[in-house]
Each structure stands twice: as structure tokens, then as C-alpha cells.
Swiss-Prot record:
Keyword NAD: yes
Membrane topology: Multi-pass membrane protein
Annotated protein name in UniProt: NADH-quinone oxidoreductase subunits H/I
Gene: nuoH/I
Any Pfam family hit: NADHdh
Quaternary context: NDH-1 is composed of 13 different subunits. Subunits NuoA, H/I, J, K, L, M, N constitute the membrane sector of the complex.
The family this protein is said to belong to: In the N-terminal section; belongs to the complex I subunit 1 family.
Function description: NDH-1 shuttles electrons from NADH, via FMN and iron-sulfur (Fe-S) centers, to quinones in the respiratory chain. The immediate electron acceptor for the enzyme in this species is believed to be ubiquinone. Couples the redox reaction to proton translocation (for every two electrons transferred, four hydrogen ions are translocated across the cytoplasmic membrane), and thus conserves the redox energy in a proton gradient. This subunit may bind ubiquinone.
Listed GO CC annotations: plasma membrane
Essential cofactor(s): [4Fe-4S] cluster
Transmembrane annotation, as ranges: 12-32, 82-102, 124-144, 170-190, 195-215, 260-280, 286-306, 318-338, 351-371
Length: 597
């Protein structure tokens, strides 16, 4: 078990190697967390998530980082530029520094040197983490103030109040831990959790810490400093490109930091969980790093689960939770832990068991307060019945209000509804996604699906369109343009006197309503099942006549053909011409002209 005497004796090259290893370990947290969050939330919503960049979308985070780096870096004219540029740095550096005293594993051997999988440790390691993580809020406050805009300033002020409120509760959780462990060194706290983890001995502290760490990292449902619906983007509204990326990096690294700290303080750090701890050497050497990482990512999953399940709290609810519940309970619990420690020092072995029992009771009391605070208010009194069958409002009769309109059936407690939400999202993760893997797998459309338009032909190849422009007049989006022209004996395109010389449909405007189909008197215009209309430029989304005409079927004659011998215009409209080309003409192969590009 590493202790403080093990630190300070590593060769310089080993200290550098451990620093590089820790930096890479931290950098991997946001890269993996962003992808995992998008994948997990997608599964909760019965989607697939990122699946384009790399195998199964595994390189999506790298692609997003490159894209972010090449975005235009805008600096508004009204900002306080030095502080504006400094704020992202102040936010991200403390997130990395906090990991310096967190033990990732036990003692390992590297090139013949025995060292701890921890960069360093100190007698006040927990206080160091608390102080360093508190510095990060200055970056948020400075970003809001230096942006010179109202929304970022409000986001910065919210963040200040949020961190102050929940930092107190978190510090009291730390106090309970090092009172029980008898040390503030992180390696010593991990050693004090053999064989019983503090999550069982200090259950109220663990519960309060889990709530506080979500508020400390500004994550949903406590993401009030960057509430999109109220503050646009909060404190980083005016940031873009790499400066915005630094704030995102700080957020995800902070998630990893508080998760690693929860693992260290309450879940035994790098020690193996039951029943693996029964295996000799299960947490020796590099195995400890595996257990530590697994516990950290369990907390990271809970962060994502919270985001995918719970809505954002109101600001007054959030502050009331911190000041009226978490802080008073934390103060009471710290006094109880201190009393139990004093009793143990006097030789009363039963104090530990009593502490566990009181902790469970206090946790149940907290849950009860949650239920009471979240219970729906009682239904208002039933309204007095109207004197007549109708009420009159502004001279207009309105129906009477039913007597049970305000009745609430089966009101649920404050925690039961969120728990039901967690059950729903957990069950949805294992359902088959509804995402269609287009274009690799194209699902056939319904038979009556209306997609791209088509100009139809008569059985001998003549066009049905007569250039009447009724379709253009019927289009509510003004997406169709038609120019008619006269047929001649030498150049005939339709059986009648007129044909559509120019026919255009602008698919940037078309809404697919089908009114043009209903307006066509000759059934010349129909809609096909083709839904692939996307293009990379505007010009190609304006379909001309040659792209709208139906392809020539076998037996049809390439335009301009003559009318079938012995037929009149009426024969075409009555359906007397059923197929075959005129004897004087040579049939064209199918698809010779017209159809989709």
C-alpha cells in the first residue's frame, strides 16, 4: 500500500514519464466521454448515434476537434480582450492539476524502479483538490464578465452562486471522510478503506457528494449557467473555435476529476470490488488501474444517464436543495462522524456500527425530505357550479367548467417520477434503434409515397403535358414554372395543339403537397417514390423538363414523333391509343430520353 514515504524518490525520467502518462490519461477522458455520451443518449432515444467517422463512429471526437479548430475565431469588439482570452485557460488548467494527487493504482515496477501510480501526494491532498477545483470557477466568472454581454454575465453570476452553494456541501463531505480516515492524504484514504469502503460507512456523505459533484460540474440537470432556453449559451455565448473547445475540455475533464475523487474517497480507489478482491493479487500492480478506471467510468455513465433522463431544475429549486437540505444535513453528519471517532478513540468499538445505522437513517430522512419537497400541491377547491348551462365571456357563450377539471389523480412523490424516468431510459437502451442506415440500407417507401415529380407520356411516346400552366397556378409555394408552345406537323410533342416547351420545378421551394397533381387536367404530372433530392448546389435542385420526363418505354418513339395513323386528339384522352409506335417511325430503346439524372 503506497504511503507518503514512497514519494519524492523517483528518478527524473520516471517523474516525466508519469506526468506524460497522466496527461494522456486525462486527455482520453473527453475524447471517449464525448463519443460515449452521444452513443448512450442516442440509445436512450432509440437512435444509433455517430456512425460515419471511423469504425462505428469511433473517430467522431477527433473529427469534431479538427472541425472546431478550423472554425472562424471571432472576438467581439466590446469584450475586455486580455481577460476574454485568459478565461478559457483559467478554466481548463485547474481541471488537469487536480489529478496530480489522485492515486490511479498501487505500487508498480517500471524499468526496475518501484513507484506508485500517482504523480504525487501530500498530507493535505484532499484540501489541495478542493482548492484547485475552486479556481476553475474564476474562468467562468471572468468569461461572463469580459464578454460584455448580458447573457454571459448572467451565466457567470449563476455559476458563482452555484459553486459557492455546492462547494460548501462538498467540503463537508470531505471533512467527514478525513475525520473517519484520520488522514487527508489521498493514498492514506484509499488505504483506510480496506476492507470496508466508505460508501457503506459514510453513506450520507456519498449521497451528498454525488449530488454536489453534478452541480459543481454544471451538468444536467444542474446546467443553469449555460441554460440554452434562458441564457442562449451562458458564459460561453461569445466564444468560438478553440476557446470554446477549451471550455468543453474543462467540463469533461472536471467530470473525470470529480468521478475519480468519488472513487478515491468512497469506493476504495484502485482496490478490486467484491468478489474479485477475494482473488489473491486481484488489485496488485497494474490491475489497480483497471479497477480504478472502471469505477470512474461508472460515474461518467451516471452523468450521461442523468442528462438523458432529467429536465433542468429551476434556479430556485436548485438553490433551495443546496442551502436548505444538503448543507444542514452535511453539518449534522460531520458532527455525528466526529462523535463516533471520539468514541472509538475511547475504546468503544460499537461506535462504528452505530455510525452506519445512523447514516442509513439519515439517508432515509433525506430521501423523505426529497419526496415531501417534490410532492404535487393539493388540488384547488372545486369551482362553484354555474347558475345556468352556459357561461358568457365577452358576449360569447362558453361551456361550463367540469367539476373535476382540477382534480389530480394519484399524485406521485418527488423521487418516484424521476426513478420511473430512469427505468424508461434504461429499458430503451436495449431496444432496437429506429435509425435507418441510409444510404447503405435503403428502406422501400410506402406505395402511396409522394416524392419526385414525373411528366408522363402516352403509350406511343407523346407527352401528356399540354402546357396549360394550371399546375403552376395551383402551387402554393410558387415552385413550378411552365411555358407552353404550339405543336407543328413537323415537330409534335403532344396530341393536342399545345405542349409544355419549358417545365421547371424548384425543389428548394416544393413542399410536396400534391396540389399540382390534382390541378392537372390530363394526368400528365404525377409523383414517384424517389425521395433522393439532395444536391450540393442550388442550380441542380431546379429540375428541367428533360429530368422530369418519364423514360421511354419499349415501343415508344423518341420525340418529336407523329400521332398514330388514323387517330385524333380525342383518341389519346379516351385511351384508345394503347401502345405501339407508328409504322413509319423507328422505336427508340427504353430510357433514350428523359427520366432522372
Amino acid at each position: 500500500m503506497p504511503d507518503l514515504s514512497l514519494f519524492g524518490h523517483d528518478p527524473f525520467w520516471l517523474v516525466v514519464a508519469k506526468s506524460v502518462f497522466l496527461f494522456v490519461y486525462i486527455i482520453l477522458i473527453p475524447l471517449v466521454a464525448v463519443l460515449a455520451e452521444r452513443k448512450v443518449v442516442a440509445r436512450m432515444q432509440m437512435r444509433v448515434g455517430p456512425n460515419r467517422v471511423g469504425p462505428f463512429g469511433s473517430l467522431q471526437s477527433i473529427a469534431d476537434g479538427v472541425k472546431m479548430a478550423f472554425k472562424e475565431d471571432l472576438v467581439p469588439a466590446i469584450v475586455d480582450k486580455p481577460i476574454y482570452l485568459l478565461a478559457p485557460v483559467v478554466s481548463v488548467i485547474p481541471a488537469f492539476m487536480a489529478f496530480a494527487v489522485i492515486p490511479l493504482g498501487g505500487e508498480v515496477s517500471v524499468a526496475g524502479n518501484t513507484t506508485a501510480l500517482q504523480l504525487t501526494d501530500m498530507p493535505v491532498g484532499v484540501l489541495y483538490i478542493l482548492a484547485i477545483t475552486s479556481i476553475g470557477v474564476y474562468g467562468i466568472v471572468l468569461a461572463g464578465w469580459a464578454s460584455g454581454s448580458t447573457y454571459p454575465l448572467l451565466g457567470g453570476l449563476r455559476s458563482t452562486a452555484q459553486v459557492i452553494s455546492y462547494e460548501i456541501a462538498m467540503a463537508l463531505c470531505f471533512a467527514a471522510v478525513f475525520l473517519h480516515a484520520g488522514t487527508m492524504a489521498t493514498s492514506g484514504i484509499v488505504g483506510a478503506q480496506h476492507p470496508t469502503w466508505f460508501v457503506f460507512l459514510l453513506l450520507p456523505s456519498f449521497l451528498i457528494y454525488c449530488v454536489s459533484m453534478v452541480g459543481e460540474t454544471n451538468r444536467a440537470p444542474f446546467d443553469l449557467p449555460e441554460a440554452e432556453g434562458e441564457l442562449v449559451g451562458g458564459f460561453h455565448t461569445e466564444y468560438s473555435s478553440l476557446k470554446f473547445a477549451m471550455f468543453m475540455l474543462a467540463e469533461y475533464v472536471n467530470m473525470g476529476t470529480v468521478s475519480a475523487l468519488a472513487t478515491t474517497l468512497f469506493l476504495g480507489g484502485w482496490s478490486a470490488p467484491w468478489p474479485f478482491n477475494l482473488i489473491p493479487g486481484a488489485d496488485a500492480g497494474w490491475w489497480g488501474l483497471l479497477w480504478f478506471t472502471a469505477k470512474v467510468w461508472t460515474f461518467m455513465f451516471v452523468f450521461v444517464w442523468l442528462r438523458g433522463t432529467l429536465p433542468r431544475l429551476r434556479y430556485d429549486q436548485f438553490m433551495r436543495l443546496g442551502w436548505q437540505l444538503l448543507i444542514p444535513v452535511s453539518l449534522l453528519w460531520v458532527m455525528l462522524v466526529a462523535t463516533a471517532r471520539l468514541l472509538r478513540a475511547d475504546g468503544h468499538a460499537w461506535a462504528t456500527g452505530a455510525q452506519v445505522v445512523v447514516g442509513v437513517a439519515l439517508t432515509a430522512a433525506m430521501i423523505g425530505l426529497f419526496l415531501r419537497a417534490g410532492r404535487r400541491p393539493a388540488a384547488p377547491p372545486e369551482p362553484e357550479p354555474e347558475p345556468s348551462g352556459e357561461a358568457v365571456f365577452l358576449g360569447f357563450p362558453t361551456p361550463p367548467v367540469p367539476a373535476d377539471a382540477h382534480r389530480v389523480d394519484n399524485p406521485k412523490g418527488g423521487l418516484l417520477e424521476p426513478l420511473a424516468g430512469f427505468a424508461v431510459t434504461a429499458a430503451t437502451m436495449f431496444k432496437k434503434p429506429n435509425t435507418e442506415f441510409y444510404p447503405e440500407q435503403k428502406v422501400p417507401t410506402a406505395p402511396r409515397y409522394h416524392g419526385r415529380h414525373q411528366l408522363n407520356r402516352h403509350p406511343d411516346g407523346l407527352e401528356k403535358c399540354i402546357g396549360c400552366e394550371l399546375c403552376a397556378w395551383a402551387c402554393p409555394a410558387d415552385a413550378i414554372y411552365v411555358e407552353g408552345a404550339d405543336n407543328t406537323e413537323d415537330e409534335r410533342y403532344s396530341p393536342g395543339e399545345r405542349y409544355g416547351r419549358v417545365y421547371q420545378i424548384n425543389y428548394l421551394r416544393c413542399i410536396g403537397c400534391g396540389l399540382c397533381i390534382e390541378a392537372c387536367p390530363t394526368r400528365a404530372l404525377t409523383m414517384t417514390n424517389d425521395y433522393e433530392l439532395t444536391d450540393d448546389n442550388r442550380a441542380d435542385l431546379i429540375y428541367e423538363k428533360d429530368r422530369l420526363l418519364a423514360p421511354l418505354a419499349p415501343g415508344m418513339v423518341a420525340p418529336p414523333p407523329a400521332m398514330a395513323p388514323g387517330t385524333t386528339e380525342a383518341d389519346y384522352y379516351l385511351g384508345a391509343v394503347t401502345g405501339g409506335a407508328p409504322a413509319a417511325e423507328q422505336p427508340a430503346p427504353a430510357g433514350a430520353k428523359g427520366g432522372a439524372r
